[in-house]
């Protein structure tokens, strides 16, 4: 191992040990399943904001977005970022406070639990379907995080991808299963700081090695359509592509996904004071906009570095930040330690999402299927054991899915994002803003939204032309329409449900 690799390893080991220690500390504070899954609703506004956005950004912030910008310019990635920024703001503005109050009023600690109690579904069918959808889409989403860790260590140290991926999974599972929601939230808060430091260091060093910002822009301008948000760059033909109105709307639709992301919505449910949501919203939006803009710029800088010969040509564009960090590590001991911080940032972006996803998937299986659907009564100790065993079991499945070293982080995240947005987005909005929405509409909307994601991606989109759009948009619309139509043609909600809705509506 070289001196640079040793310095990088030291930084990463310190980071990983710190994450596990946080899990150990919070394991002593986790007394029941309410603490394990929702932290007792005691999350402060700053931790709520930063942990929500760190768990949101995942590995696509430091791998997916820069990689996409590098190979295709600003068109697709630019509109994606705009859609995500708008979606983030609207989610905090119209969903966060209402969901916090509603979930506390009906004593719901998971998203399936919220839907079941909101619609007074005594059959538990809504809870079961919601839990099943969470597991279906979260397991591959978590697998993408494990895959990112495997790529990181494999590229850096020549470690076998599978060994690196399994070790990373063990660390994530370790601190999450020990400390639950509070551990995940605190580590996510710390990880958001590390991710920020990583982005800044990479950008400054990259611009310097590329010959300055003027040279970066000049290189980008030499590539046809690279900086044009209505064209984009086609690397295969070395010419400008085409990014018309349909593709723009389709890509902006990424923002719709936020209304249905269980691991983000759980943070809204956990904030200590609903009146502090405004503080969280401002912090979250500022961090998201700046971090995504820097991530995209790093991709553009990476292309300039390749053109200037500062970086060799490499196959996997999603490893651009790893490539820049490796170059930095060769400058000296201190730069190598900084490179370690950068790479810990990639780990942070992955782990901050994976831990939250594991909690959501594990709660869906243990709380909502075992305890909810099958009505198996367990004491607090048994519930905690089941929660942790379920979390480990789901992680094992994630490792199996991530076993293919050629899997694309951006591709997996894109599909899972569409799934959650289409399944839970429409029903979440209607549950908060339309009192005529009932359990029949909610159930039908979730099922149709989930099915349409698969149908559109694997069948309709292949027709091309106007049908070649991001599956989230048509699936979201279908789920919304079905929910509304079915609600209108079936009996209206019980008086008790409407009373609670009106009570919260007037309780500003």
Positions of predicted regions on the chain:
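Membrane-embedded helix-loop-helix hairpins and adjacent transmembrane boundary segments
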Residues: 1-508
